[in-house]
């Protein structure tokens, strides 16, 4: 019974990223075995045969000897200690050679048919010279290349490798790369080999979409949107090309016109013709007007107004208006009661061709809690804006509305927040700006704020006129109040001086009847 020890180099012994390898036995299955060379010579108890193990772990390592010596021993009953001693010695020798090479790379092993066939045909008596050995190792390096990224392993196994330098278009290269990635994933599904070349594989190769699995609804919508965009661009490009071609055709037709015709047209200018009208139309118009005048006698002004209102009403059916209308009935203007009723369906009706259809979804338009808000995006305050803020603060005080006019991109809320922030950070400077007042330059303020202010003299004249008018109205009001007070006082005096009705008694004698009391 024979066994083979598979040794692989490791990184530093204390590194926690070093991959771990364990010895395993070869399984007899349909899979291809690891390449090794054997000599068909009988073994005795004291003889040990050395073989060349060709593996990916040592194909690209920078070692002086390209072949690592391993031991294939046979369990012999005669001298078991010698075989175990030779095995341990060879393992130690391999470890020394491999630890001396710091530039080692880990990759996924691959087994090919061509090097197997080349090795199987070697006879036991074959002697590899130095040149033959170099040629043989070049062929092995060609098939056992470690510097292959993960996304191209399937291409290497097939013996094909696409690259951007080929004559294929970019589109075909992209499709072939996607196929390679999907094939790689399909090949590795359910297998135990999950080793990745960490020195060569990029994160983008692992994050790329291999195009395997069921498409989601979001992916389908994105594909549809991209297709519509490409289609619109293509139609626009075709329209521009057709317009340019038609323009070129028109220019060619104008250039190809005979020169003589153009000269004749230029030499004989055409007279401008005015179309006044045709005799038939004039005759028909005159006959129609005569028939109308004979059939309908001259209408009154009210009847003509009623006809005009009816025509306007028919024309305004499309443009619905909720204003009340009037009509003429028996020579009188009467309010149309039907116009007082408002039909909301007719009012809100919009023709189909004038409607604007807007399709909104989460892909084309993101709707969040801040979508319908009016909050402006805050901007950072630099040193220049801060100095400008302190200058405005010393001019206008804490009137943040006037200060906000000096900053077109900011509102009153942002100015107030800036004031609170500066009051916490630098209260001494804020107090100094509020105590020391600076003169106000209206020209600079109007230039910065974009508002036009009239001169102060005109404003003072207007204020003086307003004051005079106010004083005059006040004087008139006082005079009117005094007159009213005089009238009230006069009435009170008359009431006081008038005799009381209870003191005087009137007597009326009618037919011997005496009436005592006041006669009303």
UniProtKB/Swiss-Prot annotation:
UniProt-listed GO biological process terms: RNA polymerase III preinitiation complex assembly
Family: Belongs to the TFC5 family.
Cellular compartment(s): Nucleus
Keywords attached to this entry: Activator, Nucleus, Transcription, Transcription regulation
UniProt key word Transcription: yes
Biological role stated in the UniProt entry: General activator of RNA polymerase III transcription.
Main subcellular location of this protein, as a coarse class: nucleus
PANTHER family per UniProt: RNA POLYMERASE III TRANSCRIPTION INITIATION FACTOR B, TRANSCRIPTION FACTOR TFIIIB COMPONENT B'' HOMOLOG
Protein name: Transcription factor TFIIIB component B''
Spans annotated as Disordered: 1-94, 155-177, 233-297
Domain SANT: 376-427
Keyword Acetylation in record: no
Compositionally biased region (Polar residues): 1-12, 41-68, 239-257
Subunit structure: TFIIIB comprises the TATA-binding protein (tbp1), the B-related factor (brf1) and the B'' component (bdp1).
Composition skew (Basic and acidic residues), residue ranges: 23-40, 85-94
InterPro entries the UniProt entry points to: Homeodomain-like_sf, SANT/Myb, SANT_dom, TFIIIB_B''_Myb
GO CC terms: nucleus; transcription factor TFIIIB complex
Acidic residues: bias regions: 279-289
GO MF: DNA binding; RNA polymerase III general transcription initiation factor activity; TFIIIC-class transcription factor complex binding
PROSITE patterns from the UniProt entry: SANT
Pfam family, one: Myb_DNA-bind_7
């Amino acid at each position: 019974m024979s066994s083979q020890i598979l040794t692989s180099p490791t990184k530093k012994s204390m590194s926690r990223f070093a991959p771990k390898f364990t010895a395993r036995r070869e399984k007899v299955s349909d899979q291809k075995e690891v390449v090794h060379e054997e000599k068909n010579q009988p073994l005795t108890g004291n003889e040990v045969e050395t073989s060349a193990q060709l593996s990916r772990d040592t194909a690209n390592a920078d070692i002086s000897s390209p072949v690592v010596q391993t031991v294939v021993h046979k369990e012999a009953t005669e001298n078991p200690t010698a075989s175990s001693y030779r095995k341990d010695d060879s393992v130690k020798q391999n470890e020394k050679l491999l630890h001396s090479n710091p530039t080692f790379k880990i990759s996924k092993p691959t087994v090919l048919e061509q090097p197997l066939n080349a090795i199987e045909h070697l006879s036991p008596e074959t002697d590899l010279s130095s040149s033959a050995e170099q040629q043989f190792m070049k062929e092995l390096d060609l098939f056992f290349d470690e510097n292959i990224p993960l996304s191209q392993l399937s291409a290497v196994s097939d013996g094909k490798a696409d690259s951007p330098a080929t004559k294929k278009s970019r589109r075909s290269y992209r499709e072939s790369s996607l196929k390679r990635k999907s094939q790689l994933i399909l090949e590795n599904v359910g297998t135990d080999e999950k080793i990745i070349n960490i020195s060569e594989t990029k994160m983008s190769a692992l994050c790329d979409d291999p195009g395997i699995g069921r498409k989601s609804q979001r992916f389908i919508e994105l594909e549809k949107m991209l297709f519509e965009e490409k289609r619109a661009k293509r139609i626009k490009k075709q329209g521009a090309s057709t317009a340019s071609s038609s323009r070129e055709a028109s220019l060619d037709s104008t250039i190809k016109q005979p020169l003589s015709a153009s000269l004749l047209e230029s030499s004989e200018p055409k007279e401008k013709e005015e179309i006044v009208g045709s005799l038939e139309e004039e005759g028909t118009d005159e006959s129609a007007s005569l028939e109308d005048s004979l059939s309908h006698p001259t209408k009154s002004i009210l009847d003509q107004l009623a006809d005009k209102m009816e025509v306007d009403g028919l024309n305004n059916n499309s443009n619905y208006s909720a204003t009340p209308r009037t009509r003429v009935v028996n020579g009188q203007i009467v309010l149309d009661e039907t116009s007082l009723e408002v039909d909301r369906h007719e009012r809100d009706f919009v023709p189909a061709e004038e409607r604007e259809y807007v399709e909104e979804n989460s892909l084309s338009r993101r709707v969040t809690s801040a979508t319908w808000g009016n909050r402006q995006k805050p901007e950072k305050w630099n040193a220049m804006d801060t100095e400008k803020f302190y200058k405005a603060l010393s001019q206008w005080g804490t009137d943040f509305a006037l200060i906000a006019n000096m900053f077109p991109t900011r509102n009153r809320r942002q100015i107030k927040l800036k004031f609170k922030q500066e009051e916490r950070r630098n209260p001494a400077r804020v107090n100094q700006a509020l105590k020391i007042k600076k003169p106000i330059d209206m020209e600079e303020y109007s230039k910065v704020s974009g508002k036009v202010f009239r001169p102060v003299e005109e404003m003072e004249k207007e204020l003086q006129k307003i004051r005079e008018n106010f004083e005059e109205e006040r004087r008139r009001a006082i005079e009117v109040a005094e007159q009213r007070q005089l009238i009230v006082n006069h009435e009170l005096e008359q009431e006081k001086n008038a005799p009381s009705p209870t003191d005087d008694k009137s007597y009326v004698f009618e037919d011997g009847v005496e009436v005592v009391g006041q006669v009303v």
